Amino acid sequence: MSFLISFDKSKKHPAHLQLANNLKIALALEYASKNLKPEVDNDNAAMELRNTKEPFLLFDANAILRYVMDDFEGQTSDKYQFALASLQNLLYHKELPQQHVEVLTNKAIENYLVELKEPLTTTDLILFANVYALNSSLVHSKFPELPSKVHNAVALAKKHVPRDSSSFKNIGAVKIQADLTVKPKDSEILPKPNERNILITSALPYVNNVPHLGNIIGSVLSADIFARYCKGRNYNALFICGTDEYGTATETKALEEGVTPRQLCDKYHKIHSDVYKWFQIGFDYFGRTTTDKQTEIAQHIFTKLNSNGYLEEQSMKQLYCPVHNSYLADRYVEGECPKCHYDDARGDQCDKCGALLDPFELINPRCKLDDASPEPKYSDHIFLSLDKLESQISEWVEKASEEGNWSKNSKTITQSWLKDGLKPRCITRDLVWGTPVPLEKYKDKVLYVWFDATIGYVSITSNYTKEWKQWWNNPEHVSLYQFMGKDNVPFHTVVFPGSQLGTEENWTMLHHLNTTEYLQYENGKFSKSRGVGVFGNNAQDSGISPSVWRYYLASVRPESSDSHFSWDDFVARNNSELLANLGNFVNRLIKFVNAKYNGVVPKFDPKKVSNYDGLVKDINEILSNYVKEMELGHERRGLEIAMSLSARGNQFLQENKLDNTLFSQSPEKSDAVVAVGLNIIYAVSSIITPYMPEIGEKINKMLNAPALKIDDRFHLAILEGHNINKAEYLFQRIDEKKIDEWRAKYGGQQV
């Protein structure tokens, strides 16, 4: 006799019923008796067994299997009745009642399918097929190794079941390797034994201006990226900052605005805080220097220096404005630079050549407030005897700069100070708004910002926690990382460390110094005083998300030389890098997994993807290089490497040709590609989060996963059975027409 057998291809049957039917057909082919070897008819869409020479037709899968195996025993047994009455009825449900399925399939295995060993009867195989179609994961867990013929039949049956998302049940399950995630944040962050404790500071922004983009990337954003990296690595890190509020500039600005210095500081502290919140700067504490703790700690350090012989009195010539009857802070004197002859140099520094100046060095000095010619006057002041501390400072700098891998410009600037020889520097001023000098003779003077401001790091920490000394008097267990623009370097490598050394107390001192050069605006310069460039409030008004601003600023971070903000480059990077690379990779795969797998990660064998070992090698190299660069504070390079992982993910999808054809015709490979691909997205999210925390959160939300810790090795942390959420767009295309509009609108006017 000549028989043809065909698989169930009915589109009306639920996928689980179709799988059960086709598994029985496949089992029939594997277990066919010697007298009956049917041939497969792939052109027939109906499930049947028919004789091509005689009028004979069977169209029930159970009957076909019994006939082909020539085994009609057991049809009245409890086992067979359970297979039909209890299990087969479930197969006709479009939506399986999962709780009911779990109970009945477990009962089937415990009572009727205790072992799956040859010889197997037709009744055994019918029961197996029904259980497998309803709960394949249970079968695989109970029987890790299926009998050879059964294994072959399962593989064949799957090929004849059109895959659709209805066979994957998304119940929001989270199946993540827990030891690979980021630890939750402590309510109060304090150093811990046997952990890497890192104290991170950003240069304290001066309070009386809106920060521009150069200020933001030069200190707070750079520090934030590193702090988020540390926390992503599960280091024990504390990130503090605050506004620097004392000094002549505040007094004078308050006079201009007709308010008290305190009112001015309150106003601008909120402006700074709001700008940084919008930029998603994740301070653990953002404070200010106008506090009782600042007075207490600064006066303590002053007193210790005095008692140890590192302070001295000198009479100092200062510039005095005869029009508004006040001593002028260095930055409120302007004139011609004696070095480069720039006409608008300030009394403390030339914006053009960067030289540090004394106001008396300026050619034709003038009062910034009223253009009057200032007069020299003498006043007694306290000086920090840096000359007496020079050998200690030099020895410390040599050791700390090497151990802490200071950036090149940090070393160069510090060495230029040391090379010229340190001289006593004035640390008091004739002002009202400041930390009072704790000496009777000088009770009407205050501590100068050069000395006072850096102590703000300590006082701000003390306002965060009463246990602040665990951070600041704990050099054996705490590493201090500081971020700033290059103009702040001497205060952090000479003045502040000198003050710490002079107290002869056990201070936590600078370990790693990370400095930036200047970020220029288009073809000009940012300037706080002149309002040239894009400021924080302008960025908020642009309608572009803070993630894009953070990304762009990090990508042009002036690490070794000055760099430029360009509107053309800003738009191009959004469209070609964020949208076309990162956004495309994440969106394409997550949409595919939702469309084809109903958001469920299938059982997978990673070896089924093309050159899996080569892929892992590539990813491990990317991750290890990322960690290496970030540990050194090379954030610009770290971002390039992070984006290269996204590009490698796109390449991975192309290499494996992930599409509908792969899903339907090569299910095992498709399953592996989506599972491995989702884990690449998870890794991308971990290393992109320091730069764009909101994007990292969005990706993790789509993945329905907690934050993955940053590692230098690739892990398959998302496991089989994990359920993801729907895709959402991460980025939007920016119309190139906006370039000229923004260039005109944000051409340097500060609100």
Curated annotation (Swiss-Prot):
Transmembrane segments: none
Annotated catalysed reactions: tRNA(Met) + L-methionine + ATP = L-methionyl-tRNA(Met) + AMP + diphosphate
Span list, region Interaction with ARC1: 36-92
Top-rank EC class of the record's enzyme: ligase
Consequence the record notes for mutating A63H: Abolishes interaction with ARC1
EC identifiers of the protein: 6.1.1.10
Residues that, per the record, bind ATP: K411
GO cellular component, one term: cytoplasmic stress granule
Intervals of motif 'HIGH' region: 205-215
Principal location: cytoplasm
Positions of modified residues (N-acetylserine): S2
A GO molecular function held by the record: sequence-specific mRNA binding
Motif 'KMSKS' region per record, residues: 525-529
GO biological process terms on file: glutamyl-tRNA aminoacylation; methionyl-tRNA aminoacylation
Alphabetical list of Pfam families matching this protein: Anticodon_3, MetRS-N, tRNA-synt_1g
Cellular localization per UniProt: Cytoplasm
PROSITE patterns in alphabetical order: AA_TRNA_LIGASE_I
Keywords recorded for this protein, A-Z: Acetylation, Aminoacyl-tRNA synthetase, ATP-binding, Cytoplasm, Ligase, Nucleotide-binding, Protein biosynthesis
HAMAP family: Met_tRNA_synth_type1
Described function: Catalyzes the attachment of methionine to tRNA(Met) in a two-step reaction: methionine is first activated by ATP to form Met-AMP and then transferred to the acceptor end of tRNA(Met).
UniProt miscellaneous comment: Present with 85000 molecules/cell in log phase SD medium.
Subunit structure: Component of a yeast aminoacyl-tRNA synthase (aaRS) complex formed by methionyl-tRNA synthase MES1, glutamyl-tRNA synthase GUS1 and the tRNA aminoacylation cofactor ARC1 in a stoichiometric complex. Interacts (via N-ter) with ARC1 (via N-ter). Can also form a stable binary complex with ARC1 that is functional in terms of aminoacylation. ARC1 increases the affinity for cognate tRNAs due to the presence of a tRNA binding domain in the middle and C-terminal part of ARC1.
Recorded family membership: Belongs to the class-I aminoacyl-tRNA synthetase family.
NCBIfam families per UniProt: metG, PRK00133.1
Protein known as: Methionine--tRNA ligase, cytoplasmic
Organism in which the protein naturally occurs: Saccharomyces cerevisiae (strain ATCC 204508 / S288c)
